[in-house]
């Protein structure tokens, strides 16, 4: 018998009080610390690449919105450290606003921030060599996971389409599901995917302002990418990617 697990999950994660939804008191002072603690993933033993500080973006916002599009044609140039710095900071970095908790450049349900960003650089240079990195959002720096050139065959092991081999880099988004589900139960899984979408549009708009080509990519080979990132695919798993260059 065929079971449509996507429909089953969607129904099971609806906000129904009689279906085991986590009961969230209206008074935040009664919440457990796990609901309000902001967790940051880091690699304390890995080398670091400090990214450039915030710089103003040029361009009229309405014009950026008009120009925003997906492209599969890239300039075939090495990654630019300054542009990558601004791309990460404006699209998924810390926001410069006065809050009682650290804000980001995108909305996150309950400020749980379940998404982690891994830049995978296909075409590098002396500033940022080809390799795999993790974006440390708190410090605005790259954790170096490993550095070595990518072959076309290795890129093909990660993504479905050949044109990706001409890109400069990819941004891989993973979801750390327990950060949301500890507060929102099964429904928290939905919020992880929504957050990936929020970040994705930020990346598109910032890339447009920086004159970087961008294409959201669902044709990922999830298990291969998770092995590349050395994540278990259960507590943390790939949810989205963007190809840039």
Question: How would you name each of these model-derived features?
Answer:
Residues 186-195:
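Short pre-catalytic strand/loop immediately N-terminal to key active-site residues, enriched for Gly-Thr
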């Amino acid at each position: 018998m065929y079971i449509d697990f996507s429909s089953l999950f969607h129904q099971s994660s609806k906000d129904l009080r009689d279906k085991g939804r986590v009961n969230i008191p209206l008074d935040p002072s009664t919440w457990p610390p796990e609901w309000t603690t902001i967790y940051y993933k880091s690699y304390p033993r890995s080398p670091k690449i400090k990214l450039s500080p915030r710089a103003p973006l040029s361009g009229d916002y309405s014009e950026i919105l008009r120009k925003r599009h997906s492209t599969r044609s890239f300039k075939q140039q090495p990654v630019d450290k300054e542009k990558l710095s601004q791309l990460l900071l404006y699209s998924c970095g810390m926001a410069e606003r006065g809050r009682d908790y650290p804000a980001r450049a995108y909305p996150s349900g309950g400020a749980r921030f379940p998404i982690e960003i891994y830049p995978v650089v296909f075409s590098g240079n002396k500033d940022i060599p080809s390799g795999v990195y993790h974006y440390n959002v708190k410090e605005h720096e790259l954790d170096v996971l490993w550095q070595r050139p990518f072959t076309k065959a290795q890129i093909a092991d990660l993504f479905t389409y050949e044109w990706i081999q001409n890109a400069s880099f990819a941004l891989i988004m993973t979801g750390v599901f327990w950060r949301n589900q500890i507060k929102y139960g099964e429904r928290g899984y939905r919020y992880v995917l929504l957050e990936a979408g929020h970040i994705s549009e930020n990346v598109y708009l910032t890339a447009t302002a920086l004159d970087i080509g961008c294409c959201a990519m669902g044709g990922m080979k999830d298990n291969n990418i998770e092995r590349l990132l050395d994540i278990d695919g259960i507590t943390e798993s790939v949810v989205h990617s963007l190809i840039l260059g």
